[in-house]
Swiss-Prot record:
Record's protein name: DNA mismatch repair protein MutS
InterPro entries: DNA_mismatch_repair_MutS (IPR005748), DNA_mismatch_repair_MutS-lik_N (IPR007695), DNA_mismatch_repair_MutS/MSH (IPR017261), DNA_mismatch_repair_MutS_C (IPR000432), DNA_mismatch_repair_MutS_clamp (IPR007861), DNA_mismatch_repair_MutS_core (IPR007696), DNA_mismatch_repair_MutS_N (IPR016151), DNA_mismatch_repair_MutS_sf (IPR036187)
Gene: mutS
GO CC, any one term: cytosol
Binding site for ATP: 665-672
Organism expressing this protein natively: Bradyrhizobium sp. (strain ORS 278)
Protein's job: This protein is involved in the repair of mismatches in DNA. It is possible that it carries out the mismatch recognition step. This protein has a weak ATPase activity.
One BP term from GO: mismatch repair
GO terms assigned for molecular function: ATP binding; ATP-dependent DNA damage sensor activity; damaged DNA binding; mismatched DNA binding
Family: Belongs to the DNA mismatch repair MutS family.
HAMAP family named in the record: MutS (MF_00096)
Amino acid sequence: MASFRAMTIQQPISVPVPQEATPAEAPAKLTPMMEQYLDIKAAHPGLMLFYRMGDFYELFFEDAEVASKALGIVLTKRGKHQGQDIPMCGVPVERSEDYLHRLIAQGIRVAVCEQMEDPAAARARGNKSVVKRGVVRVVTPGTLTEDNLLDARANNYLLSIARSRGSSGGDRLGLAWIDISTSDFIVTECAFAELTATLARINPNEVIVSDALYSDEAFEPVLRELAAVTPLTRDVFDGATAERRLCDYFAVATMDGLAVLSRLEATAAAACVTYVERTQVGQRPPLAPPAREATGSTMAIDPATRANLELTRTLAGERRGSLLDAIDCTVTSAGSRLLAQRLAAPLTEPAQIGRRLDAVNAFVADSAAREDIRVILRGAPDMTRAMARLSVGRGGPRDLAALRDGILAADQALARLSVLDQPPQEIASVMAALARPARALADEFARALDEQLPLIKRDGGFVRSGYDATLDETRNLRDASRLVVASMQARYADQTGVKALKIRHNNVLGYFVEVTAQHGDKLMSAPLNATFIHRQTLAGQVRFTTSELGEIEAKIANAGERALNLELEIFDRLCAQALAIGDDLRAAAHGFAMLDVATALAKLALDDNYVRPEVDGSLGFAIEGGRHPVVEQSLKREGQPFIANSCDLSPTPGHKSGQLWLLTGPNMAGKSTFLRQNALIALLAQIGSFVPASRARIGIVDRLFSRVGAADDLARGRSTFMVEMVETAAILNQAGERALVILDEIGRGTATFDGLSIAWAAIEHLHESNRCRTLFATHYHELTALAAKLPRLFNATVRVKEWQGDVVFLHEVLPGSADRSYGIQVAKLAGLPPAVISRAKSVLAKLEAADRGQNARALVDDLPLFAVPSRAAVEPAMSKETEELIAAVKDLHPDEMTPREALDALYRLKAKLPAK
């Protein structure tokens, strides 16, 4: 299977080459069809070949063996090659997209080979002629256009990496990524150290690299984490020919009017378009001119932080439960994709963020406009992906209808937005985009397209009657011939005296006369056998034809074929009209997406009581009444409130840098939630969203780091502690004063004093060297003493309350520090056996009474092993008074009591309590 998968240098399939053999041992000669198959296969190494034969795509040799296992289909055989059976399997053409989806999901790339002529044309050339076939497309993870192969709510990016060897500054990399299903095309440059974070942000479905870079050991750890990597020959990444290839793709004479790119960016961009042309086999999907992404224009977030904060997927890999799932109120797939893009790349320019917030605020203030627009958007189709399919010849009548409906929806949305009083800048730009497509095209499509449309254009019947006179005339001829067949059936029934006689049709026999077996002999006997010609005998039926029926069939077939060809010509003409204004249609589609995101975030703000954040260029960070957006929604579904908390990491008087909060408190109290919620509030603010707080002021965060939770990485031989240290090292080495850092329990997983010393040193480094805004949660209570010597360190704790030996979590963050972690109480809540809890308490008491530096052996001697108290000691007998109290409570029926009766019962119970 490896030869088809990503991350493998492309190699031809291992089909034995025919060798000379003596006549006695010569194997059976290959058929012309199999020779054709091997020629096509050899021309497409490293790809699984879907070889069209009639209504099936057939697979042979290793392809068949791999596909059989990957798809769970039956493996059979067809003929022999060099004395060995040729493995074979197949999939129906009509279900091929489903099978392609399953193969792509497993990293298998497929070449689709179609019949390029009708079998009749091959027969006309001679008995041994083979139907001409050719590969019409190569299906790879990054070059998909079909709806059923794509996630409607996510982009499908193909990304290329070009490298320039560096000197003391290290390698520079050019990146280009495109989505041919939406025409997006973006380029940037980055350093090697920034590559992992950049790839995590873009989240490409397929990455192409040169074979030299692919084999470079320095890149191996990066490439290993990617979903699909395809190595290509170096000529694809030839910088000397990059601009020429780009100009050729976009049909321009010079790059000056297209985009200003560095040589590295142009090299990566040219590699992308070259790969697209190869996979689409000569087709050129329309792409937007390459848009250059400025370095530092978005918040840098490394892969570990994205995973820890569960931005788009939970740690279990599910969308549900992620931040994206919590805030996504969009009603279109394009809007959902744009929201995901923004969440992956928060802005770092306050003015841009402000424009997005203005758009959201406009729809917060005008609920009627917001709801009207959302109703219109629900009827707006995904125009960008419809355009992409039409541009590469894979579109159908429903894609034309999508463009028609999209233009009409744009008109409706524009009319509704026009009544807004002084629309903000972003809404004004949306209005300009919605006005670009000409209404005349929608009117033309409305006249041309029928109400009920087939999925595939070859099915015909999609052009409305009355649109084209020639088509109507041809259809009438076809339909009239069918009426003749109906009258012929009645005449034949009278002629034969067989009332059950039927004229039927199938793709093998065409039109035929069918009678039951008991009447078959009658039609095969004189005089009827002069008219009825026997064709086929089945178990219960006998089938015949007549010369008259053959003539009518030819007329029907000819008329039907002419009608279909006329419809296909009309389809091509309509498609050309749409592609001619493709830029206008794509602009309107993007306008829909922007409008959808703005109205969705406004709805979120009103539904969940979010406020507009103040975002500026300072180092401030002041959140009042902040809440975790995901946890709050989860609690709301359960009917429980979320306890809001404030956080202020802004520079204190006399200091330029932000504060470092040291957060102590027990397990389960909400420390990790508090850390995450502040990071998520900053992130939401910088994508241009309102935030879950009563007030928020955010100074731009340029890098976000999170070290919250860790797991083993056994594949790389890393323990949990090692993973934690690697992530912490990245933070200490990379965080600047504009960064926001959240760290949870640094130093756990090793000896107590080792962990404490690591956490101690990390805090000092963050305070003195990184000087960034930081939230640091810990169970090392000794660290709180650092506040005396580190002026920007602030101690905070999560409040709890003890009640009759149990701990009650209040989830309130207050100034101060905790003196204990309540680990045993949490263990009790988790259900540890009472004997274990009791033993743990006695051990803890002894440890706390001892000097921290006391010899460990002496402590063990004082705490003999297995000194577990008896069950009676752990669970003392219940007193008679307690038993009576329990019985009295059980006898109460609160639902049947008045408030006065309930109060009286409470007083009676209190009177029974012991005086002590």
